[in-house]
Amino acid sequence: MFTLKKSFLLLFFLGTITLSLCEEERGADDDDGEEEVKRGIMDTVKGVAKTVAASLLDKLKCKITGC
C-alpha cells in the first residue's frame, strides 16, 4: 500500500510540473501574438505617415519651384 501511495504521489507531482510548463509555454505564445499585432499596427501607422510626408514634400517642392 505504501509503494502505491508513493507511485500516486510521484504521478501527481510529475503531472503538476507538466501542466505548469504547458501553461507557461501557452502564456509565452499568447504574448508573442500580441506583439505581432502591435507591430502590424505600428507598421501601418508608419506607412501612412511616410505617404503623407512624401505628398506634403512634393507639394512644397512644387510651390518652391513653381510646378
UniProtKB/Swiss-Prot annotation:
It comes from the Eukaryota. Antimicrobial peptide. The keyword Transmembrane helix does not apply. It is found in: Secreted. InterPro entries: Antimicrobial_frog_2 (IPR012521), Frog_antimicrobial_propeptide (IPR004275). The keyword Secreted applies. Disulfide bonds join C62-C67. It comes from Odorrana versabilis (Chinese bamboo leaf odorous frog). Keywords: Amphibian defense peptide, Antibiotic, Antimicrobial, Cleavage on pair of basic residues, Disulfide bond, Secreted, Signal. GO terms for biological process: defense response to Gram-negative bacterium; defense response to Gram-positive bacterium. Expressed by the skin glands. This is Ranatuerin-2Vb. One of its GO terms (cellular component) is extracellular region. Pfam families: Antimicrobial_2, FSAP_sig_propep. Residues 1-22 form the signal peptide. Belongs to the frog skin active peptide (FSAP) family. Ranatuerin subfamily. Residues 23-39 form a propeptide.
